[in-house]
């Protein structure tokens, strides 16, 4: 219950403001993994698809939370249906992305790469 409350508070906090990536699609390209993230207009939902790498073909729609870190830099996190957890630190100005994700089998991955609008 506390996690649900916390997620609701984050959602409410951002209800009146939307991040600049809202309504846009981006490609993240890391060494060994490429994915697209399509952010919905609501500032809460995102569709992802891993297009290259060992997890290619994985796709879904998730609810995400976001927090500004610095000018143009955002922490974005979500949990996928298979219980994988993902955290991005995306610098939309510089076009860079850092991803930290844990697979359903609890393998931790740390990736660094590029970010570009499609």
Protein language model features and the residues they cover:
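Beta-turn initiation residues at beta-strand->coil junctions
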Residues: 28-30, 48-52, 78, 101
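A generic beta-sheet turn/junction motif
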Residues: 30-32, 41, 80
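Beta-sheet ligand-binding and adhesion/scaffold domains
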Residues: 75-118
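Tryptophan-anchored aromatic micro-motifs
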Residues: 5, 10-35
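Contiguous, well-ordered beta-strand patches that form the walls/edges
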Residues: 54-89
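Short, solvent-exposed coil/turn segments at beta-strand boundaries
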Residues: 20-22, 38-47, 69-72, 89-97
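N-terminal glycine/threonine-rich, aromatic-flanked beta-hairpin/loop signature
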Residues: 35-67, 103
């Amino acid at each position: 219950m506390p996690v649900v409350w916390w997620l609701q508070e984050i959602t409410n906090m951002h209800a009146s403001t939307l991040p600049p990536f809202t309504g846009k699609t981006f490609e993240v390209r890391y060494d060994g993994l490429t994915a697209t993230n399509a952010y919905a207009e609501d500032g809460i939902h995102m569709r992802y698809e891993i297009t290259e790498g060992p997890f290619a073909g994985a796709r879904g729609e998730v609810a995400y939370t976001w927090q500004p870190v610095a000018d143009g830099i955002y922490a974005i996190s979500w949990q996928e249906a298979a219980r994988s957890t993902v955290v991005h630190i995306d610098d939309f100005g510089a076009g860079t992305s850092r991803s930290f994700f844990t697979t359903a089998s609890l393998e931790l991955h740390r990736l660094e790469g590029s970010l570009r609008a499609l």
